[in-house]
Amino acid sequence: MDLDVLNMFLVAGGTLLVPILAFVTSFLLWPAALIKIYYWYWRRALGMQVKFSSYGNYKFCYTSRGKPGNKASVLMLHGFSAHKDMWLSVVKFLPKNLHLVCVDMPGHEGTTRSALDDYSICGQVKRIHQFVESIGLNKRTFHLVGTSMGGNVAGVYAAQHPTDISSLTLICPAGLMYPTESKFLKHLKGLEKSGDDQRILLIPSTAGEMEDMLRLCSFVRFKIPQQVLQGLVDVRIPHNEFYRQLFMALVNEKSRHSLQENMNKIVAPTQIIWGKQDQVLDVSGAEVLAGSIRGCQVEILENCGHSVVMERPRKSAKLMTDFLSSLQSTENNKKHE
C-alpha cells in the first residue's frame, strides 16, 4: 500500500527545494499530482529506470537498476492494487550491486489492461513468465520476491517454473488456508452472506474509506492529512472497476487457495516474512508454508501489519540481503569442498 507517501512532506519541503508557498498550494489543490512527483523523484534518486518490454501484443512496464552479474537478479512482484513503485522504500536499503527488477503486475499501472485477460493467479503466473522471457531474465536463475497477491503469484511461479528460480522470498502471501481467520477474511465472509460486493475494504472510493484501508493494512497508526488521503483516493478511483474485477478473480475458487495447492512443489530455498499483527492475511499462514516447504526460513516481525514493505522497509531489505548472502556462502562452500 502507499504508506510511504508520508515521506512526501520531507521530500517536497527539503530535498526538492520547492518553495513553501508553491508546495502548499499544490498540496491543497493537486495532491494526486504531488504523489506522482514523489514517486518520480525517488525513482531518479535511487537509480530505478522505467522501461517497457513486449510479449506479442502485450506490454509490460517495469523499473530496473543495475545489470545481471555474479549475484542472482531480483524480481519483485507487488500486491493487489499497488504498483512497481511500492518497492522503492525497500530498494533504498538494498545493495547497489544487485540487479533489481520491479514489474507492474498484469492490469496495473503501465502494464497492459484488458477485460479479456485472465487475472486468476495461474493467469498472472503465465503473464509474469512471459515478462521474464521478454527481458531474458531466466537466462540465469533469479531470486523472486512477492508480497500479498504478488506473494501468491511468486509462490505458484516457483512451483511451476522451478528451473527459473534460485531462491524465493514470500512476504505475507495470499492463497493459503489460514488456521486463524483474519479481520479482513471475516469481513469478506460477511459480504458473501449479504451479497454486497461494493464495500470491499481494499477498494476505497472516499478519503474516509482510504483511512480505513490504511488502518487495516498497517499496525502503525499514522495521522494522515485529509489532502493526502484524498490524493491517494483520486489516484485509485479511475481504476476501481478493474480492481473489483481483479478481486473477484482472486477470491474465485480457481485462485483462492492457489499457493496452498502448489506449495509442496516449491523446491527453491525459501524465506517467509510476515507481520505478526497482520489483519489482512493472518500470520498463521507462515506455519502452513513452513510445514510444506522443506527448510524454509520464517521471520515474524513484531509490531508490524500487512504492509510489511512500507512499515518495515529497512528490516525487509536486511532480511532479504542476509538470506541471499547466506545462500551465496553455502554455494561457495560447496564449490570448495
From Swiss-Prot:
**Membrane topology designation:** Single-pass type II membrane protein
Keywords from UniProt, A to Z, are: Endosome, Hydrolase, Lipid metabolism, Lysosome, Membrane, Mitochondrion, Signal-anchor, Transmembrane, Transmembrane helix
InterPro entries, A to Z? AB_hydrolase_1, AB_hydrolase_fold, AB_hydrolase_sf
* MF-aspect GO terms: monoacylglycerol lipase activity
UniProt record, GO biological process? acylglycerol catabolic process; lysobisphosphatidic acid metabolic process; monoacylglycerol catabolic process
Annotated active site residues, numbered on this chain, are 148, 278, 306
The family database entries (Gene3D superfamilies) matched by this protein are listed as: alpha/beta hydrolase
List the protein's name: Monoacylglycerol lipase abhd6-A
The taxonomy runs: Eukaryota, Metazoa, Chordata, Craniata, Vertebrata
